Amino acid sequence: PTFDNPYTSDFSVESAVVRQPDLIIFDIGLLSKLKDSGVLTQLEKVGIPVLIIDFRQQPLTNTVASMALLGKVFDEQPNADAFIRFYQQRLELVRQRVATLKPEQRPSVFIERSAGIKGEQCCNTFGKGSFGQFIDTAGGDNIGSKLFSDMGGEVNVEQVIASNPDFYLLTGADWSRGHRGTLAVPLGYTTDMATSQKKLAHLLDRTGINVLKAVKEKRVMAIYHQFYDTPLNFIAVEAIAKFLHPALFKDIDPQADIESVHQKFTALDYSGVFWLTPQ
């Protein structure tokens, strides 16, 4: 069974008791709320076990441990172990090459979080966690990491202009159902390139964003927002690394990797668009 979003509502222990799940899996971002509200204690009392995983806050640190746990509880250890080996190999390759860069070879990057989700409004960004980790691991210098020590926060467009980033990234997804009037770049399994390109062009024409040198020179990438909450986060690292350092990663093919992962490790058919650059 699934439950209402515990980030936007209180978790109902009563509902859990009625449904009698064998296990409830929570994201680590809910841990403090679950403790403070007494939910964890109540679930323990009624004998419902809980598993905490993290693909969101410190994804590159905790994905391996989270996948190992999921492999155990779902009796899929061989599959989980194979995924972990592939995951570690791909990330290690990126890290080894990025380690050869001098500090001045790491371009500055501003990443706009959920760009356009609330219309023309700008800008939220990522700090040292989540996509901030992806950028730094991929050989970039995330501007938000200097502003926020955790997941991120809000900056005004004047700050973005003043930072004059070498590259401008933005995250997007198909939020059309839950966010009325969204202008976000639709990315994910049900999206198409033509629609995503049109939405991206509109966001790049916003006042303040359209004056950025990175935008004028098309050093721009839109990337799937939910990469930061999935074990496929290494694909985002690969795609960003290749975008920032095309010569260094000319033999890396993130598109082939994401298709291969779906075929080998999931029950999902690959489809859609997960990142793009402006035409």
Regions found by a protein language model. Name each.
Residues P1-R19, L23-K35, V39, I143:
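A short, structured surface patch at a secondary-structure boundary
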Residues F11, G153-Q159, L203-N210:
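Alpha-helical scaffolding within the catalytic cores
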Residues V13-V17, G132, V157-E158:
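Short hydrophobic/charged patches on amphipathic alpha-helices used for structural packing
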Residues I28-G29, G172-A173, Y224:
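Short secondary-structure boundary segments
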Residues G38-E120, G152, V211-P278:
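Extracytoplasmic substrate-binding proteins
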Residues K128-D150:
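His/Asp/Glu-enriched short active-site or ligand-binding loop at hydrolase and phosphoryl-transfer sites
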Residues I143-E158, N164-T191:
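Pocket-lining segment of extracytoplasmic ligand-binding domains
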Residues R177-K213:
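C-terminal lobe and pocket-closing loops
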